[in-house]
Amino acid sequence: MDNITVGGVTLHSPLLNAAGTMGFGSSYADYIDLHRLGGLVTRTMTVKPRRGAEAPRLWETPSGLLNCVGMQNPGYEKFTQVFYKGLVGYDVPIIASVTGTPEEIRRMADALAELPAVAGVEVNLHCTYEEYRTLGSKAYLEQCAQRIRAAADGRLPVWAKLSPCAGDIVDAARTAQNAGAQAVVCANTYWGMALQADGSSRLGSMVGGLSGPAIRPLSVFQTWRVAQEVAVDVVGCGGIVCAADVKEYMAAGAKAVEIGTANFTEPETIIRITEAL
């Protein structure tokens, strides 16, 4: 495939992995040629290391996967000092996924801009059910704007990964665009729950995020809605397992796609789909 520019980032193809589904990439190098990815999206990073959520973190559902990983990561400095070095030789554009306060995001964006192979920053605007209940729609959108503006103050192109559950995703997309995002990703996982007969959760928290083929019709719909309302590039994400799924997102208005849960069961998914397109 020819190179393509999406949201200010030049990619090898329009097929990337979704954040959190390939770690920092090096662990997948034994299974696939990372150079053949359109781009590599890292695990979401924070300023300080996070232990993440309590186990169990995963629960398989029919055609889907519930997770509550809790943003576990070693902190961005571990990436810049250790994991980044293992990726440089693969000649793949790196999109660094980050989250945190505006000040933390600005700090990470500045540091990541010093790494030549990092081509862009994806700001994870994920919001848990509990956080959204506390914030409400207006405060959440203002938080999104502040985070995107902080990243946009840096030297790298900024993508915004939108939540499909925290209010209207179109409002969040417009907010991200107005704050300086050059692309929006539709979308993150959907809030979901898996309970035992006694009412206790099958996960370490009551509410998890649902991904996989079960959410694809929902995410295609949200991609279609957003693509009609913003001028920036749209990246579709959710439930992709084959070339037909990619074409469906493109028909909905996406310029590129991110593939997530499928990488867990078939690490070669992106390569297979690239060859089929």
Predicted regions and their residues:
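Hydrophobic faces of well-ordered beta-strands that scaffold small-molecule active sites
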Residues: 15-19, 38-42, 94-98, 121-123, ...
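Glycine-rich beta-to-alpha transition loops that act as phosphate-gripper elements at the mouths
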Residues: 22, 98-100, 162-168, 216, ...
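C-terminal helical cap(s) of enzyme catalytic domains, especially alpha/beta-barrels
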Residues: 52-62, 195-208, 250, 256, ...
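N-terminal capping/small domains of soluble enzymes
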Residues: 1-93, 99, 106, 273
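Conserved alpha/beta-domain cores
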Residues: 78, 88, 97-154, 162, ...
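Glycine/Thr-rich beta-alpha phosphate-binding loop at enzyme active sites
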Residues: 65, 127-139, 172-228, 232, ...
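Glycine-rich phosphate-binding active-site loops on the catalytic face of alpha/beta enzymes
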Residues: 42-47, 123-129, 183-193, 239-240, ...
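Catalytic cores of alpha/beta
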Residues: 26-31, 105-115, 166-179, 227-230, ...
